[in-house]
Amino acid sequence: MTSKIKKIGVLTSGGDAPGMNAAIRSVVRTCAYHKIECVGIYRGYQGMIEGDFKEMGPRSVNNIINKGGTILKSARSSEFRTDEGQQKAYDNLVAGGIDALVVIGGDGSFSGAQFFSNSFNFPVMGIPGTIDNDIFGTSHTLGFDTALNTVIDCIDKIRDTASSHNRLFLVEVMGRDAGHIALNAGIGAGAEEILIPEEDLGLKRLLESLEKSKASGKSSSIVVIAEGDKIGKTVFELKDYIEENLPEYDTRVSVLGHMQRGGSPSCYDRVLASRLGVKAVESLLEGKSNFMVGMINDKVALTPLIQAIKGHTQIDRELLRVSDIMST
């Protein structure tokens, strides 16, 4: 494989996700395999502006495939949104001999990469890393599978105490704009009800569902709630509302928060990261740019960055039906 590209930079940007380190490892080792150099860029786009670079080789990524977070760190950069900031970043890349970029992150990170690439005609490739699984052009993003396993493990433990005390637990999970975590983890954990941004269940229907569960003989219940659900109340306000209207329920709240982003990545995320990293580097070496590598129909595929940024993921309607049936 011949290419004008001799050195590739890799960075992580936006919210961290399990599997990012595995993706960094894959990018670095694929570069080494093709006998080109790789440079780690610390703290995302801010590190590009400040020239915070470090040469990376196969041994520098030993024993990170199992690590959560990102060894390259991540940071927001308002300066990168300015012409001056982008010019500084470009000048540093040129000074460092970097010919192309692999950006691991979400749609915000991809927006920055797309604009930068268009401004300076600089080759970029994106790898989707976010636990929310809300990026168009891939069935799975890095970290989603691990986050699901983390959430299910937490809910299983919550179920133990809920059953012991005949309580209703409202479990809030991440997902401001997308309910993929809530829906999949809710089904996997046997939740009695699931609230997501894509569906407006309504307070009346929620109360009816809880009353039905109680009448059917269920002594405890779990409601999984995406943080961006359309119910119109915070999870704590919802608790008060339920206790006011259904006083027979002893209701508790558990907000899982940032623990969903942490932890050792699952086998699926490690393999996914390895596959996407290889494809990202080899696509750049083939002369491709402004694409995101993702999974479509269980195959690694390229989606134009602009589509990944502007497209919208859809909830699997069949999962909604399965959830409804399983709550019987």
Annotate each language-model stretch with its function.
Residues 103-105, 111, 115, 120, ...:
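Accessory alpha-helical/coil subdomains and C-terminal extensions
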Residues 13-16, 41-47, 76-77, 106-108, ...:
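Short, ordered loop/turn segments at secondary-structure junctions
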Residues 2-49:
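N-terminal phosphate-binding or glycine-rich loops at protein starts, especially the Walker A/P-loop
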Residues 36-42, 161-168, 219-222, 248-256, ...:
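Flexible, glycine/charged-enriched surface loops at secondary-structure junctions
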Residues 25-34, 54-60, 115-125, 142-146, ...:
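A glycine- and small-aliphatic-rich helix-loop capping segment at beta-alpha/alpha-beta transitions
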Residues 2, 48-103, 109, 142-149, ...:
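Glycine-rich oxoanion-binding loops at beta->alpha junctions
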Residues 240-328:
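C-terminal non-catalytic interaction/assembly regions of soluble proteins
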